[in-house]
Each structure stands twice: as structure tokens, then as C-alpha cells.
């Protein structure tokens, strides 16, 4: 008996939390024949185990930015063909920037979201415009870095000084200033996403042990000085969703 299957593994990380991970396996048995499908397994962490990727409170326009790192690990038996990486965020008006006590419209409860991500609803493609808070969280630089056995083997800088690089404009990144505000920001990433990103090499001997293989997204973000008073106390949750595909994109 011949069998054919295509496996997909999806992991997601919120920029203010740490993802768990799981595995997919398929076992079939018939008579003396035994078939076991290889696993596809990815995990997401920061550069420090147990820490969030980005967690910023009481941020003010023009203040120094923040570094954020996301590591994508490949722990399965099947390396896979490529990664799809998408971005989304939820935007809430709030009075004090503290998500633990609920979302209450603050002293400047006038944020215009008519053409930007809907308050309290994950970002949906088609909500264009530079009125949402995500459009004011600027990307100074963004790298995709592949490490094999702790050695950097490839470094794609796709954003530098708020603008797409030649590498970022080309496939597979195809960056675009989607909201046409003159710089790259979180809203641009949510509108586009990435496909056909090479997966990291398999690392099946444990993480953070001196022989690590992973793909790292390294970014530096800051809060635009153009952000107005209407964002006082407001909160944006930014998520990264990673999918490992076994077969090439059509």
C-alpha cells in the first residue's frame, strides 16, 4: 500500500508571551507492514528561555526604542520545505496601559480606527491607513538570521533605517510600505507577511546547549514622534504566526 500525505505544523507567539509547542505524527499498521510518518515540530522562543520577545510599558513617543528577538526552532524529523510567517495585532483604547485591569477608554478616547485595525479585533487585511497605533510603531531594522550549530550562516537584513533594503524588496520578502506613510511599521507587516522562508536546520539535541540551530528574527522598534495624544494609555498586542509547510507553495 502506498500512502501520500502533506503535513503542516503551525506555531504562534504573542510578543508578550511564550509559545508552547507540540508535534504531529501518524502511525499505520497492516499485517507485517508498518508505516510511521515523520514529525514536523517547530517552537518559538526569545533569545532568553522563558522571557517575552517584547514587553514595553509606559512608552512615550520619541523615547529610545527596544530590541526584540524571536527564535524559530525546528525539532521534528522532517525539516519541511518552507516557512510562512504572518503578523497580526489587536488594538485597544485604555486609560492606563495596563491590560490586567480591563480596557477602559482613557482621557484621549478619540482614536480614529475607521481605516485601521478595529479596536479589540485582530487585524484584518483591507483596513488601510495610518491611524492605528501599529502604524506608529516603526521598524528601524529587521534581520532574518540563520544559525547552524551556533554559527551564523546567513543574515538577511530586510529593513534598515526604517526603509526596505534591496534584499527586503526582493523575493521571498517582497516588502512594501502598505499604508504609504513613508516608513516601515508593524501595520505594514500585518498587511503583507512572508512566504517561502527557508526553515532552520533540525535541532534535536535540545535548545540553549551550545550547539543550537535556529532562525532568528531580530528587530528594533520605536514609537514615532508623530503619534498624537489620542494614543495615551492605549495598548497594542502584536502576534507572530509561523507555519512550517512540507511542500512548496503553489
UniProtKB/Swiss-Prot annotation:
Keywords: Signal. This is Uncharacterized protein AF_1659. InterPro entries: EF_Hand_1_Ca_BS (IPR018247), Peptidase_M73_camelysin (IPR022121), Signal_pept_SipW-depend-type (IPR023833). Pfam families: Peptidase_M73 (PF12389). It comes from Archaeoglobus fulgidus (strain ATCC 49558 / DSM 4304 / JCM 9628 / NBRC 100126 / VC-16). Residues 1-24 form the signal peptide. The keyword Signal applies. NCBIfam families: cognate_SipW. It comes from the Archaea.
